[in-house]
Every structure is written in C-alpha cells, then in structure tokens.
C-alpha cells in the first residue's frame, strides 16, 4: 500500500484499507464479497473478498476483449451476477453521427473540403476523437446488452448468457433472484426504457414486459415533447411491488409491478426546470419517519455552468402519491472540498441504494462520501464524511 502525498479528509469515518485498482462505476457488496464494475476497458469486473475489511483480496478480474464497450455496472442476487454491456464514449459518438452533414455544410460555406480541426470544432468534439467517430460510423455498434454469470465459485465466474438489446445498450439496472429490471435503448424508442427479464433460466433470460414514458415509442407514432433523449429512464429500483424510476430531465416516476407483465405508472414528479441537473436515483426509505413515507432523490452533476446550482440531494414526502411534496434538500458547498475548483465534476452523483434507517450514504464527485441523517426530513444533517485524495495523474478524486 502506497503512502499518499495528500491524506484523505475525514470526519467520523476511518479508512481500514485500500486497493490500487482502476476506477469503478458501481460497487455491489454481498456476503463479504465486493463486486466492482470498472469504468474503462480492458477492465471489466473485479470480485474482491472483503470478509476481512482490513485486508481486501482480489479473487477474480474479468477483462474485456476490446475497447468498444464498458461494463461499469454490476449486481448480484444469490449465485447470479449480471454485468451491463454499454457502448464506450456513447454520448461523444452519438454526437459524431452528424459528421457527414457537418462536413458538407462546412465545405459549402468554406468553398473547400474542411480539415479535421474545423470538423471537430463544429461538432464540439476533441479533434483526436474523430478517428473513433469515423470507425463508429463505418462499423456501427451492436454489442450493447447484458451478461449473466454463475458465481457459485466467485473465483471462477461462468458466463451463462449474453443478451443483446439495442443502441447504446444497457446502463444501470436492478435485479433480484426472479427478474432483471434493465434500463436500455430498444429499437423503435428514443432514449432508454425499462425492459423486465425473467431469470428463471439464467441461461435464457426471457423478456416479460416493457415500460416507457409517453413520447418515447416513436415507432408506434408517439412524438416526444423534448429534444433528443434528455427524457429517458436512467434506472429503476424495486421495493416491494413498486419500481422507483429516475427519468433524467423528467424527474422520477413510480411504477406498479404487482402484475409483472403489465407495469403501470402510479405516481410522477418533475422538478425540471428550473433545476438544471438530471435525476439520477429515487428510492423510498424502508420505514416510515414520523408517520410519513419519505423518499430520497439525487441529481447527477454534469458540466457545471457558473451561476447555476450544483447537483444535490432531495428529501420528499411521498405518503400520498398524488401529492408528492419536497420537504428539504442537502447541499455540499464548494468550500468543503479542496478539489471543488479542479478539473472534473464536483456535485452530487449517487447514494447507497438501500435506505434501511435514517442514514443516507451519498457521494459527491470531488466532494467525497457524505453521510446524511434524515431523522428530521425537514432538516437533513451531515454526521460524517470522507474525501479521498486525488489518484496519481488525476486532478481530483471522482
């Protein structure tokens, strides 16, 4: 273990150990094992024994065959593990689909063929990414979906099936021992929708139903009232017979899955605009607080515009699904992290997707882990935090 040049900043949290592994997009911990979905190829998934938290031990690392995809999300139920397969650099490459038209327009306006610097500037892309864009336009992308693994022996995960979906492929998702609740693009729809798969035979997952917002199913004649794919499913989390769906710039919705074959929307709440950052996760607490059903919602920070709010945490009263009411918010000031002005994102991102008490464990990009007590839902209070130092060759912790 290396001695860090800059120590972590901490209150009421003690770090027991660390591992020098590539960054992850999701960590799932089950029965003393940590499953890490890595952000970038060739790193796929790491399975780590954390039964002794002071001495974590890597059991297995799964690597990817190419750099076209990343598998940065992972979940586990029993002896089954699911990893997503999503197009790497997806937003950048989707923007690059305009390259042929932009090149023609530039040629007409300039009176000559444009050079790469001019094309990249018109697309709003780094010039060194045009090679990737041209490869994508030539080859397309057909690998998006999810993989199902048998982890009876976590040191030797066995691939059981690979389900291909469409477009970008699969982003975040939820699962239990019966079903997978997948957020993915699908042919005929704009933006990610919910597709539910039966896992009774993990070697052959079977689609049982779909859910989307009105306006997404363009193949059926629906017309979105928004531009692009800004309104879409980020992911949905199951609690009892409900799925709590964060739908990006459309806020959050609650889906009844009492009949798994006919999911239906029973509640929705949208606070966009005026709040600029999209809704990342929504989830109710497992117990009532002062007789109220409370839900926690977090937005995800993107490129920050000065003068606008950073992404933050919301607390809602959802006792009456027809009258959802915001009770409070929790914010982290730029003054509370030495990396808030460094390159990279600062604001909120995600919380632990299980709220079994009044403590919410929520992360800020360069603002670190914040432990927030919502025992008084009108006045959330931070009780602990931990900000790791920036990794080598990175300007800030993310």
Predicted regions and their residues:
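Short, charged amphipathic recognition helices of the HTH superfamily
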Residues: 108-122
């Amino acid at each position: 273990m290396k001695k860090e040049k800059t120590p972590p900043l901490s209150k009421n949290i003690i770090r027991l150990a660390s591992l020098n592994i590539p960054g992850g997009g999701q960590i799932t911990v089950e029965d003393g094992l940590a499953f890490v979905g890595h952000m970038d190829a060739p790193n796929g998934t790491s399975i780590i024994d954390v039964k002794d938290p002071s001495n974590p031990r890597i059991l297995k690392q799964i690597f990817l065959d190419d750099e076209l995809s990343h598998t940065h999300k992972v979940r586990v139920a029993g002896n089954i593990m699911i990893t997503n397969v999503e197009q790497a650099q997806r937003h950048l490459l989707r923007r690059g689909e305009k390259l042929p038209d932009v090149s023609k327009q530039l040629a007409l306006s300039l009176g000559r063929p444009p050079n790469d610097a001019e094309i990249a500037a018109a697309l709003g892309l780094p010039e060194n990414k045009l090679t990737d864009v041209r490869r994508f336009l030539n080859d397309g992308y057909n690998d998006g979906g999810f993989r199902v693994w048998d982890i009876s022996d976590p040191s030797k995960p066995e691939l059981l099936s690979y389900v291909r979906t469409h477009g970008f492929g699969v982003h975040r998702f939820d699962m239990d021992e019966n079903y997978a609740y997948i957020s993915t693009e699908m042919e005929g729809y704009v933006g990610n929708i919910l597709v539910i798969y039966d896992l009774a035979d993990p070697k052959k997952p079977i689609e049982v139903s779909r859910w989307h917002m009105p306006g997404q199913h363009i193949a059926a004649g629906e017309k979105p009232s928004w531009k692009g794919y800004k309104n879409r499913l980020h992911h949905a989390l199951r609690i009892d017979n409900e799925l709590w769906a964060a739908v990006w710039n459309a806020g959050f919705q609650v889906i009844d899955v009492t009949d798994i074959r006919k999911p239906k929307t029973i509640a929705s709440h949208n606070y966009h605009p005026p709040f600029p950052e999209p809704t990342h996760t929504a989830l109710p607490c497992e117990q009532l607080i002062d007789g109220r059903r409370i839900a926690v919602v977090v937005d995800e920070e993107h490129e920050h515009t000065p003068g606008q709010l950073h992404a933050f945490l919301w607390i809602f009263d959802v006792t009456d699904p027809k009258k959802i009411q915001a009770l409070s918010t929790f914010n982290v000031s730029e003054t509370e992290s030495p990396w808030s002005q460094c390159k990279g994102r600062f604001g909120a991102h995600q919380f632990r997707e299980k709220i079994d008490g009044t403590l919410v464990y929520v992360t800020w990009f360069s603002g670190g882990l914040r432990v927030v007590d919502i025992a008084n839902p009108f006045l959330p209070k931070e009780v602990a935090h931990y900000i790791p130092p920036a990794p080598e060759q990175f300007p800030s912790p993310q």
